[in-house]
Amino acid sequence: AGTAKGVITNDASLVMVNGRMSQGTKEDIHARVLVLNDGGSRLVFVTYDLNCLDVATPILRQRVRTELGIDPSRLILLATHNHNAPIQINPDNFVYGHGLAERMFGLIQEAIAAERGPVQVEFGSGHGYFITARGNAPVDYEIQLLQVTHQDAPMAMLFSHGTHPAQASRSMIDAGHPGYAMEEIEAAFPDVLAMYSDASGGNQFPRQPADWETRTAEAREAGTAAYDALLETRARELGHELAEAVTRIANGPLEDVGGPITSSIEIVGLPLLPPISREEALKLAEEFPPDVGFVHYPNRYRSTNWVRMLLRYYEKGLSN
């Protein structure tokens, strides 16, 4: 197994996932790589302190196949769902996205060059009860851990938890509470690479104290510095809780999952309902400016692009 880690913080101000332009850096964001080699093939995990990858994904898949002989089914790309990082679906950020592909491919090469073994691969799980779900939905508290050990010392700890991150600022680049968790784990386990992946947590969020709304209102009233300080304090608290939970799992009984590596990838086709009628689409289109066109994130009318596209299909006779 081999590991690598590199900074992927943007130099220029870019549109972040939260819709704001980044205004400096509070904490660097990183990409991390774990390569497992069973002697006949490799499995590559890449995690990154971003909400998504998009632009870099097809580039990486092609390069690992053609230059490294690794099938895309063996390239596992995992985001932390970080909101305070450049979003990849805005055209102004595409150059950054191409740079990400180059940076991450280099880290994959670095991890392969650093392979050592034999290693033991183990799996464990536990719970992190400091999250909640919107409404009355059930909450998935599970934390999963994949630990790679070499010569009785962990060299990589890949863990996941299903939640949006708690960010450390409003308008600065930071890695949120998962970033602080990884920092704490790496400090507690010498020479380990901590890797976090967001699990299925689109409806789940960190649980906040009962007086959180009062504290945030007071901090906003006091100004940006006070508000950011409150956000950072809470993100660090949640990061500590996550790190403690992962450490408990790592120190508990783990299941040996070593052996030959198998991996597959499949595109699943889902049936679609018939589109709404042209008349219904025209009525919907009356609710927003007629000349808005097709717009990208974070434009407020981006969510209505589908109506204009459907009308174009009707105009060209492509709706069936």
Spans of features found by a protein language model:
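Non-catalytic substrate/cofactor recognition surfaces at enzyme active-site rims
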Residues: 1-320
